Amino acid sequence: MASTSLLQSTSSSFAGVRFHCRTSAAPRVGLSSFTVKAAAGTAVFVDKAEAETINRLKTNYIEKMVPLLKEEFSYSNILEVPKVVKIVVNCGIGDASQNAKGLDAAINELALITGQRPVKTKAKTSIAGFKVREGMTLGIAVTLRGNLMYSFLDRLINLALPRTRDFQGVNPNSFDGHGNYSVGFREQSVFPEIKPEIVGKARGMDVCITTTAKTDKEAYKLLSLMGMPFREGSGPSTLVRKKKLKSHHFDAKKGRRY
């Protein structure tokens, strides 16, 4: 087995590269990975478990938000506490079938924003009025889960939304009644990964945040604790249809209102 000094001298020219080596002390364990970092001509070996960073939003949720939500809504089991399970980002591209370069540019931009390569969304049926054929590419979409989801949500709340032009808070009534929230963007340049000077065309996108909350009130509280800047002086409200007054009803047989 090579000594540590030999490994250090060998890896000095491969800064930032992750190596895999099999140790003789534990042959059944398998591969043990470490990260090499160069600083002033020296190499520092870091274990893989120590090199992995934990997202701050996920850490705050586990350590601070879960106890607050459990106490406020009187959950008997910690598994009842609502959480974000996935985020779906959709981007519609009307001229995708005629402009292949525009489609590739949109895919690259959404991949930079989300950290995951999107998939193409295609038409399921043909609509002659909109010149849409079955199987035609209409847009792209990304489904985020796990650490990528928390990282994207953190950047969306703290970087993208404040950079929106004339931003006064997101609409608190954009819940779907089942604890899921949607927010839209008119242009992708609000994300810091996209440079406005190199963007060829402004493209909007829709972000749907799916949670395990049973009600909009629970989801509203969850996202508020995460830092979602809801519009002040308002909260989630359910649509209530107004009953028609009797004076609005007209009896055709009698020819009068009642």
From Swiss-Prot:
GO annotation terms (biological process): translation
Domain of life: Eukaryota
Protein name, per record: Large ribosomal subunit protein uL5c
GO cellular component terms given for this protein: chloroplast; ribonucleoprotein complex; ribosome
GO molecular function, one term: structural constituent of ribosome
Native source organism of the sequence: Spinacia oleracea
Role description: Component of the chloroplast ribosome (chloro-ribosome), a dedicated translation machinery responsible for the synthesis of chloroplast genome-encoded proteins, including proteins of the transcription and translation machinery and components of the photosynthetic apparatus.
Location relative to the cell: Plastid, Chloroplast
Subunit structure: Component of the chloroplast large ribosomal subunit (LSU). Mature 70S chloroplast ribosomes of higher plants consist of a small (30S) and a large (50S) subunit. The 30S small subunit contains 1 molecule of ribosomal RNA (16S rRNA) and 24 different proteins. The 50S large subunit contains 3 rRNA molecules (23S, 5S and 4.5S rRNA) and 33 different proteins.
Keywords associated with the record: Chloroplast, Plastid, Ribonucleoprotein, Ribosomal protein, RNA-binding, rRNA-binding, Transit peptide
InterPro entries: Ribosomal_uL5 (IPR002132), Ribosomal_uL5_bac-type (IPR020930), Ribosomal_uL5_C (IPR031309), Ribosomal_uL5_CS (IPR020929), Ribosomal_uL5_dom_sf (IPR022803), Ribosomal_uL5_N (IPR031310)
Pfam entry (one): Ribosomal_L5
Main location group: plastid
HAMAP family (alphabetical): Ribosomal_uL5_B (MF_01333_B)
SUPFAM superfamilies from the UniProt entry: RL5-like
Family in the record: Belongs to the universal ribosomal protein uL5 family.
Presequence positions on this chain: 1-38
